[in-house]
Amino acid sequence: LFANVKINQRVVETGFEKLFVAPPMTDDGTALGAAWHVLSGDPNFNPKPLHSMYLGPSYSKEEIGSQVAEKKIQVRKPVDPAKEIASILAKGGVVALYQGAAEFGPRALGNRSILASATDPEINQTLNERLNRTEFMPFAPISRMEDAEQLYKNICRVQHSAEFMTVTVDCS
Protein backbone atom coordinates (compact mmCIF):
# COMPACT_ATOMS: atom_id res chain seq x y z
CA LEU A 1 0.00 0.00 0.00
CA PHE A 2 2.66 2.55 1.01
CA ALA A 3 4.65 1.92 -2.18
CA ASN A 4 1.91 3.98 -3.87
CA VAL A 5 3.30 7.51 -3.69
CA LYS A 6 -0.01 9.11 -4.69
CA ILE A 7 -1.86 7.37 -1.82
CA ASN A 8 0.83 8.65 0.54
CA GLN A 9 0.19 12.19 -0.73
CA ARG A 10 -3.55 11.76 -0.13
CA VAL A 11 -2.88 10.53 3.43
CA VAL A 12 -0.98 13.75 4.16
CA GLU A 13 -3.79 15.81 2.65
CA THR A 14 -6.26 14.36 5.19
CA GLY A 15 -4.63 16.58 7.79
CA PHE A 16 -1.44 14.91 8.98
CA GLU A 17 1.07 17.48 10.09
CA LYS A 18 3.98 15.30 8.92
CA LEU A 19 4.37 11.91 7.27
CA PHE A 20 7.36 9.63 6.95
CA VAL A 21 7.16 6.49 4.83
CA ALA A 22 10.07 4.11 5.32
CA PRO A 23 12.02 3.90 2.05
CA PRO A 24 12.11 0.08 1.88
CA MET A 25 8.29 -0.09 1.89
CA THR A 26 8.13 -3.35 -0.07
CA ASP A 27 9.11 -6.91 0.82
CA ASP A 28 12.74 -5.93 1.34
CA GLY A 29 11.70 -3.70 4.25
CA THR A 30 9.67 -6.30 6.12
CA ALA A 31 12.47 -7.16 8.56
CA LEU A 32 13.11 -3.47 9.23
CA GLY A 33 9.40 -2.86 9.85
CA ALA A 34 9.22 -5.84 12.20
CA ALA A 35 12.22 -4.55 14.16
CA TRP A 36 10.71 -1.05 14.42
CA HIS A 37 7.40 -2.54 15.56
CA VAL A 38 9.06 -4.52 18.36
CA LEU A 39 11.24 -1.58 19.39
CA SER A 40 8.26 0.80 19.45
CA GLY A 41 7.05 -1.02 22.58
CA ASP A 42 10.28 -0.18 24.41
CA PRO A 43 9.93 3.10 26.35
CA ASN A 44 13.69 3.68 25.92
CA PHE A 45 13.49 3.42 22.11
CA ASN A 46 14.49 6.74 20.60
CA PRO A 47 14.18 6.48 16.81
CA LYS A 48 16.50 8.58 14.69
CA PRO A 49 15.76 9.84 11.17
CA LEU A 50 17.18 7.82 8.30
CA HIS A 51 19.81 9.74 6.40
CA SER A 52 20.77 7.29 3.67
CA MET A 53 19.41 4.31 1.80
CA TYR A 54 22.73 3.64 0.07
CA LEU A 55 23.05 0.33 1.90
CA GLY A 56 23.30 -1.99 -1.11
CA PRO A 57 26.42 -3.41 -2.73
CA SER A 58 29.25 -1.26 -3.97
CA TYR A 59 32.14 -2.27 -6.18
CA SER A 60 35.81 -1.32 -6.24
CA LYS A 61 37.39 0.54 -9.15
CA GLU A 62 39.17 -2.70 -10.03
CA GLU A 63 35.91 -4.69 -10.16
CA ILE A 64 34.25 -2.02 -12.28
CA GLY A 65 37.33 -1.75 -14.53
CA SER A 66 37.33 -5.50 -15.08
CA GLN A 67 33.68 -5.49 -16.19
CA VAL A 68 34.18 -2.43 -18.39
CA ALA A 69 37.14 -4.10 -20.11
CA GLU A 70 35.34 -7.44 -20.49
CA LYS A 71 32.26 -5.79 -22.01
CA LYS A 72 34.38 -3.39 -24.12
CA ILE A 73 32.55 -0.34 -22.80
CA GLN A 74 34.01 3.06 -23.60
CA VAL A 75 34.58 5.12 -20.47
CA ARG A 76 35.83 8.63 -19.94
CA LYS A 77 36.05 10.60 -16.74
CA PRO A 78 34.90 14.21 -17.07
CA VAL A 79 36.71 16.87 -15.08
CA ASP A 80 33.41 18.27 -13.78
CA PRO A 81 30.77 15.48 -13.81
CA ALA A 82 27.88 17.73 -12.71
CA LYS A 83 28.61 20.23 -15.48
CA GLU A 84 28.96 17.45 -18.06
CA ILE A 85 25.67 15.83 -16.99
CA ALA A 86 23.88 19.20 -17.10
CA SER A 87 25.23 19.81 -20.61
CA ILE A 88 24.09 16.39 -21.86
CA LEU A 89 20.62 16.85 -20.34
CA ALA A 90 20.31 20.38 -21.76
CA LYS A 91 20.92 18.92 -25.23
CA GLY A 92 18.15 16.35 -24.74
CA GLY A 93 20.48 13.47 -23.92
CA VAL A 94 19.99 10.70 -21.39
CA VAL A 95 22.52 9.85 -18.67
CA ALA A 96 22.92 6.57 -16.81
CA LEU A 97 24.39 7.36 -13.40
CA TYR A 98 26.30 4.68 -11.49
CA GLN A 99 28.16 5.69 -8.35
CA GLY A 100 28.80 4.48 -4.80
CA ALA A 101 26.67 1.87 -3.07
CA ALA A 102 23.34 0.75 -4.51
CA GLU A 103 20.10 1.92 -2.96
CA PHE A 104 18.25 -0.32 -0.47
CA GLY A 105 14.60 -0.37 -1.42
CA PRO A 106 12.70 0.01 -4.68
CA ARG A 107 13.66 3.59 -5.59
CA ALA A 108 16.61 4.83 -7.63
CA LEU A 109 17.88 7.70 -5.49
CA GLY A 110 20.82 8.91 -7.55
CA ASN A 111 23.42 6.17 -7.28
CA ARG A 112 21.78 3.87 -9.85
CA SER A 113 19.67 6.30 -11.84
CA ILE A 114 18.74 7.31 -15.35
CA LEU A 115 18.58 11.07 -15.82
CA ALA A 116 16.72 12.91 -18.57
CA SER A 117 15.37 16.41 -19.10
CA ALA A 118 11.78 16.92 -17.99
CA THR A 119 11.28 19.59 -20.67
CA ASP A 120 10.64 16.95 -23.35
CA PRO A 121 6.93 16.02 -23.22
CA GLU A 122 7.72 12.64 -24.85
CA ILE A 123 10.49 11.65 -22.42
CA ASN A 124 8.31 9.29 -20.34
CA GLN A 125 7.26 7.34 -23.41
CA THR A 126 10.80 7.38 -24.84
CA LEU A 127 12.38 6.06 -21.64
CA ASN A 128 9.66 3.48 -21.06
CA GLU A 129 10.20 2.12 -24.58
CA ARG A 130 14.00 2.08 -24.27
CA LEU A 131 13.87 0.42 -20.85
CA ASN A 132 10.95 -1.89 -21.59
CA ARG A 133 9.03 -0.39 -18.65
CA THR A 134 5.29 -0.26 -18.18
CA GLU A 135 3.49 3.05 -18.63
CA PHE A 136 2.64 3.55 -14.95
CA MET A 137 6.21 3.35 -13.66
CA PRO A 138 6.93 6.64 -11.88
CA PHE A 139 9.53 9.24 -12.72
CA ALA A 140 10.69 11.80 -10.20
CA PRO A 141 12.15 15.29 -10.50
CA ILE A 142 15.52 16.27 -9.12
CA SER A 143 15.85 19.73 -7.67
CA ARG A 144 18.08 21.57 -5.28
CA MET A 145 17.01 21.33 -1.65
CA GLU A 146 17.08 25.11 -1.28
CA ASP A 147 14.49 25.43 -4.07
CA ALA A 148 12.05 22.79 -2.73
CA GLU A 149 9.64 25.12 -0.88
CA GLN A 150 9.36 27.31 -3.97
CA LEU A 151 8.78 24.36 -6.32
CA TYR A 152 6.53 21.99 -4.36
CA LYS A 153 3.33 22.58 -2.38
CA ASN A 154 3.33 21.36 1.24
CA ILE A 155 6.86 19.96 0.92
CA CYS A 156 7.58 20.88 4.54
CA ARG A 157 5.12 18.18 5.66
CA VAL A 158 6.79 15.39 3.70
CA GLN A 159 10.30 16.59 2.90
CA HIS A 160 12.10 13.67 4.56
CA SER A 161 9.87 11.14 2.76
CA ALA A 162 10.27 13.02 -0.52
CA GLU A 163 14.05 12.62 -0.28
CA PHE A 164 13.45 8.86 -0.58
CA MET A 165 10.72 9.14 -3.28
CA THR A 166 7.99 7.65 -1.10
CA VAL A 167 5.46 10.46 -1.57
CA THR A 168 4.36 12.86 -4.28
CA VAL A 169 3.54 16.54 -3.94
CA ASP A 170 1.91 18.98 -6.30
CA CYS A 171 4.15 21.47 -8.06
CA SER A 172 3.78 25.18 -7.30
Q: Where in this protein do the model-derived segments appear?
A:
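Flexible beta->alpha loop and helix N-cap segments adjacent to enzyme active/binding sites
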Residues: 2-172
